[in-house]
């Protein structure tokens, strides 16, 4: 074996030896001698700042520096004056020193130049090798001196190389060494040679003098003799090593800052070769000149030595830009040797071997050669990750098949491009990287070299690939910056423009074959055209695995997203989302790499290159994207069905799936809604929501074709957009299928890994939703206005309460109402029971089922109607104000009401036992029962009013009413819709049992509400003791049953009719229980406050009058909404009263009664909440104590025929407009929805029907209570005598009616109560309210009938809530519904009033 043959198990040894040899040569050329007679072992110069480093020295034999003929004489010395003492004269020691024992440590060299520890064993093997053909003069020296046994001073070695001395290798180096000046102008490789270092060293200083400089100078004794950057980069752990030469190109040399495009190689740019590059190259290549190399050595060092002259000595002047004078031998194996000079020049003139195959038949089997690096002298193997071409094929293609190619003149100039192919052997397995790169890099072109420009109308031919790249960048790309279009011939992109210039530059590498991004690890020859592909490849060396499996509990990590997707789809899922788009091919794969391989192998490379396999995802069950989606949308959806990407920004490998959640059956089905672990179908109504949606005709505003079904959205999103709550309550079943929100594409984000429900049937949806993007989308949804869709609603005879039917005249506004009817008994949100859930906040909604006391129900409920116009909610859809008080997280019970409640909830009742009382007296499965949908909304209305902000400011206005027991001794808002409750007069006047029972159970605002079990059978026992009846008997008499006490009252106050298939939820309006005493300064003008305070002073007087009012024992009353008119058949008791009483009782009754009247709101004082159902069952003190000018009239009451079940018809709209109706106003001191009790005269269709008509002398409204808004009713008539006119209500009875007992009471009020308020202020307010009422009259709706069933009382008719003070219901007195709008309008009015004063 040759002395320089290294073991094959150490493939990198020889390449490192080359570099070490070059360092040794540089050290020899630059070393200075020490003082005579001194071995200079371990001596330190006073100015030396480095460690004790022993280096060899050159001992000259002559005296002149320009004609030195010297042999290499090794000398052991210190690094005292080698680098910094420029200009010092050194004495040379003339003797040859042998056998000097050096006891220094292996780190005798400076740390920057120490030999790697893992190579010391190899060097020791070389020194002890008996087959050495030369004598190592440093055999007894430290291991740092044995640079792989390459003693350049050996006369035997130099003689065998044809070099008499090292001076012939480079005369200037020896001359400079003798002169002692490293900065000499004769030494072309000094610090001034290329200005790589910051500045020349001082002429007489030491290295310490340069410490204070801004740019650190090297402390090496021989760093100036070769490329300093190459030295710095050399390290086994470095990303760029010296043996790889240039790892960059002129087009992309900046991908790594330490990679120079033209470093070290004299062949890279022969027209501008720099001497320092030549010197460094020669010194580095000297190891290859010393001894012949075996094929293994050639394989290991081929990438650093491109040419190896064997006969003549290589001098500096041999390096010529034109290599035609050189006879360079290509050696790929010991048996294959050809002279390049004998090769026809046409072999190197072809643009690539593909052209050669087209032009010449013998090249059919020629494989494109492995390209060299952009530096031609340093051969490089650019291996594509998807292909492993053998490097010797390049030689065979270029050399063996070259004889038949026509001649060309570019053989010598192209030699530096193709000569490298022959010097590379097959990289065997032992030379492979330790960490094999198994990554299937995406979108990497094959390996070829293009030198001719095929741009349209351009046929320029270039010598090198670099020149072509420069030409394309400068002449084609830079000159046309308006449109970045590839006009390369036969480009499959079809001149589709790029968005940025860099994308076009990257794309052009497909045509030129340029791969500037090369792996910088030792022994790895892979190169890539895209930097991201190189970064992915580098992870195979570094072991970095940033892509972790997203499946819960799986801890596997991967270096690229493709492997992770493969793992997830194969291991945790059965999905195969990557579909081959080839015609007739039905293959599907779990990962994109498998699809790419399939396309390449089955359909061919051309099919793959032309991207014919690409296509939009199939419009099937696994992909609901439309066919007209763009490719960019595919990237947004992370559908990697296309293995190639055109743009660099599309080439990034993203996680293509989130298979942590497998596809389940359609979530929109009601059977899949789990309510606290119980299927909704087990306890709720079992109907298909598609029944309602199948016949809908949606306009353009509801773009459902390209939207995701709301039921398919994750639970978190449904909770946020009011489609349902975080527990997937049954309220989402009916409404969600119609609420096809505009989600698709906007919610296709990533980041949150929902482990329960994803978009089931969409493969690209199996990924996560990002918190930030999700918050942004939710905010957009909140800010969107609603859409009034004109929808045809089919009749639903058997699925709703009372079988509500549709009014054909109100298609536009009955959409949401019908939806609410559709989900009747399953409506209502559980959110009202989760007081502190954070299900509507954007930060804590990831765990929707985890309850938090810190987020109020206002967060989860009150802002729900502000997000989207949800048809399933009895609320107002509007713009969302993120800082509106309606979304206050601290609002407690007043914000508990979820707006998802439909006709089945009776949440207006006071909360007893901390439970929401529900009256779901729904009549299901009964035909011919219908009612007009009551939720008439305007989608642009603002959100609900404030909650906690209203809680403390106006208490002082109510202090004088302490004798009247309110819930919390304050004034609270009144519900905005009512139940038709029938009242019985059998309570004593002074007991106020109703209030006391409720007040005793009032909880503080910070107490959490216990969760309610959704099992209706369990909940029935909580609320109802007498099912199927809901009759409240209230009176002012003293004959109350002794069996009724407070405890029994709490238990028996409300009876709830519930069936097993009904969901029991309680939804409360966010304005509920608003303390009006806390917001007076915010919303009331000063004059209004003065007026109200004066009016309040007469409270005690009025109360006495009201308490003296006798009330008959039999009264009949109906409560209807002022927003709509309806005719209903309801059950009532024999004793019912039209006047608001003070006590409540519950008695079952089977008497039927038919009524029609208008009622907007009762005076309930502090007893009721905003959204809870209000009744006339309120204390008389609360109903009348605050009324200053209430004309209490005794009513003619009557009893209807018990057996009468006939229906009463509604008068036409014209009849109602021409009708004379009298208003009996009972106005509470509530902040929102100040009501009026309007009894409208109804004309009977049938004479046998029980109809009563109310007559009056005046159309008057009585202003009552301490009003919290500045709007005054337009119908208020102030009399000159300071009194309000008396309203006389007289019944009209038929022969079947019992004769009533009339009673009349007139309450007179002094005019001074209202005279304090300026007339202009009142007039402006009046005009404002009138304009609002006029606006609402245009939206007036007709009335449907309410027909009850025998044996099933329906007494809990819901009335719609007044949504805004700017959009009041027609005929109302003072519509103050929405704090958001009220605050805005009244503050502006207050400013105007102050300016007018």
Swiss-Prot record:
One of its GO terms (biological process) is negative regulation of hippo signaling. Residues 193-212, 361-383, 636-669, 807-877 are annotated as: Disordered. Keywords: Activator, Developmental protein, DNA-binding, Metal-binding, Nucleus, Phosphoprotein, Repeat, Repressor, Segmentation polarity protein, Transcription, Transcription regulation, Ubl conjugation, Zinc, Zinc-finger. Disruption phenotype: RNAi-mediated knockdown severely reduces adult survival following the ingestion of E.carotovora. Abolishes Cad99C-dependent formation of endosomes and DUOX-dependent up-regulation of reactive oxygen species (ROS) in the intestines of adults fed bacteria-derived uracil. InterPro entries: GLI-like (IPR043359), Znf-C2H2_ZIC1-5/GLI1-3-like (IPR056436), Znf_C2H2_sf (IPR036236), Znf_C2H2_type (IPR013087). One of its GO terms (molecular function) is sequence-specific DNA binding. Residues 1-440, 1161-1397 are annotated as: Interaction with RDX. Pfam families: zf-C2H2, zf-C2H2_15. Residues 807-832, 839-848 have a biased composition (Polar residues). Transmembrane segments: none annotated. Residues 657-669, 849-863 have a biased composition (Low complexity). GO terms for cellular component: cytosol; Hedgehog signaling complex; nucleoplasm; nucleus; protein-containing complex. A zinc finger (C2H2-type) spans 451-476, 484-511, 517-541, 547-572, 578-603. The keyword Cell membrane does not apply. It is found in: Nucleus. Polyubiquitinated by RDX in the presence of CUL3, which results in proteasomal degradation. Phosphorylated on multiple sites by protein kinase A (PKA) and phosphorylation by PKA primes further phosphorylation by CK1 and GSK3. Phosphorylation is essential for its proteolytic processing. cos recruits multiple kinases to promote efficient phosphorylation of ci while Hh signaling inhibits phosphorylation by restricting the accessibility of ci to the kinases. Phosphorylation by CkIalpha and dco enhances binding to Slmb, the F-box recognition component of the SCF(slmb) E3 ubiquitin-protein ligase required for ci processing. Belongs to the GLI C2H2-type zinc-finger protein family. PANTHER family: TRANSCRIPTIONAL ACTIVATOR CUBITUS INTERRUPTUS. Interacts with RDX. Interacts with cos. Interacts with slmb; the interaction is enhanced by phosphorylation by CkIalpha and dco. Has a dual function as a transcriptional activator and a repressor of the hedgehog (Hh) pathway. The full-length ci form (ciFL), acts as an activator (ciA) while ciR, its C-terminally truncated form, acts as a repressor. Involved in segment polarity. Required for the normal development of the posterior half of each embryonic segment. Engrailed protein directly represses ci expression in posterior compartment cells. This is Transcriptional activator cubitus interruptus. It comes from Drosophila melanogaster (Fruit fly).
């Amino acid at each position: 074996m040759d002395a320089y043959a290294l073991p094959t198990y150490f493939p990198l040894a020889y390449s490192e030896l080359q570099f070490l040899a070059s360092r040794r040569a540089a050290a020899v050329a630059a070393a200075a001698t020490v003082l005579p007679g001194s071995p200079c072992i371990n001596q330190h110069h006073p100015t030396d700042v480095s460690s004790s480093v022993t280096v060899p020295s050159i001992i000259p034999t002559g005296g002149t520096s320009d004609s030195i003929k010297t042999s290499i004489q090794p000398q052991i010395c210190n690094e005292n004056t080698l680098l910094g003492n420029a200009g010092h004269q050194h004495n040379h020691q003339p003797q040859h020193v042998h056998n000097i024992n050096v006891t220094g440590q292996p780190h005798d060299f400076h740390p920057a130049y120490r030999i790697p520890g893992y190579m010391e064993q190899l060097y020791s093997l070389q020194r002890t090798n008996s087959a050495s053909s030369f004598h190592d003069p440093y055999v007894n020296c430290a291991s740092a001196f044995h640079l792989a046994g390459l003693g350049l001073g050996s006369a035997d070695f130099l003689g065998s190389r044809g070099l008499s001395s090292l001076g012939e290798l480079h005369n200037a180096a020896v001359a400079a060494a003798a002169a002692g000046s490293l900065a000499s102008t004769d030494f072309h490789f000094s610090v001034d040679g290329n200005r790589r270092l910051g500045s020349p060293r001082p002429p007489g200083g030491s290295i310490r003098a340069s410490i204070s400089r801004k740019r650190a100078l090297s402390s090496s004794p021989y760093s100036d003799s070769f490329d300093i950057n190459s030295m710095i980069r050399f390290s086994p752990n470095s990303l760029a090593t010296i043996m790889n030469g240039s790892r960059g190109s002129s087009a992309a040399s900046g991908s790594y800052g330490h990679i120079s495009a033209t470093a070290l190689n004299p062949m890279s740019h022969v027209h501008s070769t720099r001497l320092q590059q030549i010197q460094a190259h020669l010194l580095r290549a000297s190891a290859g000149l010393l001894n012949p190399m075996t094929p293994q050595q050639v394989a290991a060092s081929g990438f650093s030595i491109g040419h190896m002259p064997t006969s003549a000595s290589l001098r500096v002047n041999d390096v010529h830009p034109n290599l035609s004078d050189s006879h360079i031998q290509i050696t790929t194996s010991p048996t294959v040797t050809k002279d390049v000079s004998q090769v026809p020049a046409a072999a190197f003139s072809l643009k690539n071997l593909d052209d050669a195959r087209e032009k010449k038949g013998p090249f059919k089997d020629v494989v494109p050669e492995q390209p060299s690096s952009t530096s031609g002298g340093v051969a490089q193997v650019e291996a594509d990750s998807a292909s492993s071409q053998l490097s010797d094929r390049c030689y065979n293609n270029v050399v063996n098949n070259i004889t038949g190619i026509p001649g060309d003149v570019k053989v010598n100039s192209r030699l530096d491009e193709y000569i490298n192919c022959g010097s590379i052997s097959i990289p065997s397995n032992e030379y492979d990287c330790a960490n094999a790169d198994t990554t299937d890099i995406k979108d990497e072109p094959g390996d070829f070299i293009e030198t001719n420009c095929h741009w349209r109308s351009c046929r320029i031919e270039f010598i090198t690939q670099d020149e072509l790249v420069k030409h394309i960048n400068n002449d084609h790309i830079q000159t046309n910056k308006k449109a970045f279009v590839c006009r390369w011939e036969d480009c499959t992109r079809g001149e589709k423009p790029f968005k940025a210039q860099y994308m076009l530059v990257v794309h052009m590498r497909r045509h030129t074959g340029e791969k500037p991004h090369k792996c910088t690890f030792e022994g790895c020859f892979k190169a890539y055209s895209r930097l991201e592909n190189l970064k992915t490849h580098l992870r195979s060396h570094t072991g970095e695995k940033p892509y972790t499996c997203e499946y819960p509990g799986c801890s596997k990590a991967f270096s690229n997203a493709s492997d992770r997707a493969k793992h997830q789809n194969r291991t945790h899922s059965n999905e195969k989302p990557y579909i081959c788009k080839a015609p007739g091919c039905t293959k599907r794969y779990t990962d994109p790499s498998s699809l790419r391989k399939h396309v390449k192998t089955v359909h061919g490379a051309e099919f793959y290159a032309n991207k014919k396999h690409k296509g939009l995802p199939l419009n099937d069950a696994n992909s609901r994207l439309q066919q007209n989606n763009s490719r960019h949308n595919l990237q947004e959806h992370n559908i990697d069905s296309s293995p190639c990407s055109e743009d660099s920004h599309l080439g990034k490998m993203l996680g293509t799936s989130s298979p942590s959640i497998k596809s389940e059956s359609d979530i929109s089905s009601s059977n899949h809604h789990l309510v606290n672990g119980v299927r909704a179908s087990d306890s709720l109504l079992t109907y298909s929501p598609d029944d309602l949606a199948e016949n809908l005709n949606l306009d353009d505003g509801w773009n459902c074709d390209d939207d995701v079904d709301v039921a398919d959205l994750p639970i978190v999103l449904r909770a946020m957009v009011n489609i349902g709550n975080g527990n997937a309550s049954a309220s989402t079943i009916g409404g969600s299928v119609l609420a096809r929100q505009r989600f698709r594409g906007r919610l296709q984000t990533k980041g949150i890994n929902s482990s329960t429900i994803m978009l089931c049937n969409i493969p690209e949806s199996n990924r996560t939703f990002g918190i930030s993007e999700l918050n942004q989308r939710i905010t957009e949804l909140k800010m969107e206005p609603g859409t009034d869709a004109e929808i045809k609603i089919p009749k639903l005879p058997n699925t709703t309460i009372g079988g509500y039917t549709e009014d054909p005249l109100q298609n536009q506004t009955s959409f949401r109402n019908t939806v609410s009817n559709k989900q009747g008994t399953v409506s209502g949100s559980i959110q009202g029971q989760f007081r502190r859930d954070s299900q509507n906040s954007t930060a804590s909604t990831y765990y929707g089922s985890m309850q938090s006391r810190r987020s109020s129900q206002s967060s989860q409920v009150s802002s729900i109607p502000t997000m989207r116009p949800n048809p399933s909610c009895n609320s107002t859809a509007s713009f969302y104000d993120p800082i509106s008080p309606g979304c206050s997280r601290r609002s407690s019970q007043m914000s508990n009401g979820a707006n998802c409640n439909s006709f089945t909830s009776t949440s207006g009742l006071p909360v007893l036992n901390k439970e929401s009382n529900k009256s779901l007296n729904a009549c299901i499965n009964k035909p011919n029962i219908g009612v007009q949908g009551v939720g008439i909304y305007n989608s642009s209305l603002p959100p609900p009013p404030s909650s906690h902000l209203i809680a403390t400011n106006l208490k002082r206005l109510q202090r004088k009413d302490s004798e009247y027991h309110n819930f919390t001794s304050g004034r609270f808002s009144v519900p905005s819709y009512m139940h038709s409750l029938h009242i019985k007069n059998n309570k004593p006047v002074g007991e106020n049992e109703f209030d006391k029972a409720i007040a005793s159970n009032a909880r503080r605002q910070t107490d959490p509400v216990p969760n309610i079990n959704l099992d209706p059978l369990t909940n029935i026992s909580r609320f109802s003791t007498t099912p199927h009846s809901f009759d409240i008997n209230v009176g002012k008499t003293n004959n109350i049953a002794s069996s009724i006490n407070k405890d029994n009252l709490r238990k028996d106050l409300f009876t709830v009719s519930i069936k097993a298939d009904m969901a029991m939820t309680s939804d409360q309006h966010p304005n509920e229980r608003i303390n009006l005493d806390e917001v007076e300064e915010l919303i009331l003008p000063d004059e209004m406050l003065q007026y109200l305070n004066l009016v309040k002073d007469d409270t005690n007087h009025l109360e006495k009058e009201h308490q003296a009012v006798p009330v008959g024992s039999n009264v009949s009353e109906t409560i209807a909404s002022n927003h709509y008119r309806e005719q209903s058949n309801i059950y009532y008791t024999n004793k019912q009263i039209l006047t608001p009483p003070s006590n409540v009782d519950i008695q079952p009754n089977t008497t039927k009664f038919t009524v029609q009247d208008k009622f907007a709101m009762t005076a309930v004082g502090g007893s009721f909440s905003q959204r809870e159902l209000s009744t006339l069952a309120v204390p008389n003190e609360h109903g009348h104590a605050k009324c200053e000018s209430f004309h209490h009239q005794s009513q003619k009451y009557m009893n209807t025929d018990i057996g009468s079940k006939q229906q009463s018809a509604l008068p036409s709209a014209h009849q109602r407009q021409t009708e004379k109706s009298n208003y009996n106003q009972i106005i509470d001191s509530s902040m929102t929805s100040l009501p009026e009790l309007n009894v409208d005269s109804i004309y009977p269709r049938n004479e046998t029907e029980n109809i009563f008509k109310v007559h009056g002398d005046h159309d008057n409204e009585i202003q009552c209570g301490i009003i919290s808004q500045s709007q005054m009713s337009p119908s208020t008539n102030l009399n000159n005598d300071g009194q309000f006119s008396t309203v006389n209500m007289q019944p009209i009875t038929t022969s079947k009616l019992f004769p009533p007992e009339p009673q009349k009471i007139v309450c007179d009020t002094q005019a001074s109560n209202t005279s304090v308020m300026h007339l202009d202020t009142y007039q402006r307010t009046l005009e404002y309210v009138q304009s609002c009422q006029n606006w609402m009259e245009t939206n007036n709706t007709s009335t449907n009938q309410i027909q009850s069933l025998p044996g099933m009382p329906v007494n809990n008719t819901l009335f719609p809530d007044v949504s805004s003070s700017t959009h009041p219901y027609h005929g109302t007195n003072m519509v103050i519904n929405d704090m958001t709008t009220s605050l805005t309008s009244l503050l502006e009015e207050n400013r105007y009033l102050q300016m007018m004063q």
